[in-house]
C-alpha cells in the first residue's frame, strides 16, 4: 500500500541537511548514508549517494527515473551465488 499523498515523502532530516549543504556548495563527493528508508526527492538528482547495505556503502547515482523510490531499493543486501550445479548433468 503506497504512502498517503497528504503526508508527503519521508526523508531523514540528517540526510536532507547533507543534501542541501552539498547543493549549496556544488559538491560532487558521494554522501554517505545509512538511511535506506529515505525516499529520493528531486533535490537529489545528479548526486551520488553511498547507501549502506549492511557491509559496505554502495554508490548510487540518482537520476530522474528514481524519484519516489527508496534509497534501499538500489543497494542490494543479499548476495546471490547461484543454485548448486547438478553433477549428473555435467558427466553426460
From Swiss-Prot:
The GO cellular component terms are:
cytoplasm; small ribosomal subunit
Q: Which UniProt keywords apply?
A: Ribonucleoprotein, Ribosomal protein, RNA-binding, rRNA-binding
Q: Which Pfam families match?
A: Ribosomal_S19
Q: Which InterPro entries match?
A: Ribosomal_uS19 (IPR002222), Ribosomal_uS19_bac-type (IPR005732), Ribosomal_uS19_CS (IPR020934), Ribosomal_uS19_SF (IPR023575)
**An example Gene Ontology molecular-function term:** rRNA binding
- Superkingdom of origin: Bacteria
Q: Which GO terms describe its biological process?
A: ribosomal small subunit assembly; translation
Family membership noted in the UniProt record: Belongs to the universal ribosomal protein uS19 family.
Give a short account of what the protein does.
Answer: Protein S19 forms a complex with S13 that binds strongly to the 16S ribosomal RNA.
What is the name of this protein?
Small ribosomal subunit protein uS19
Source organism phylogeny: Bacteria, Pseudomonadati, Pseudomonadota, Gammaproteobacteria, Alteromonadales
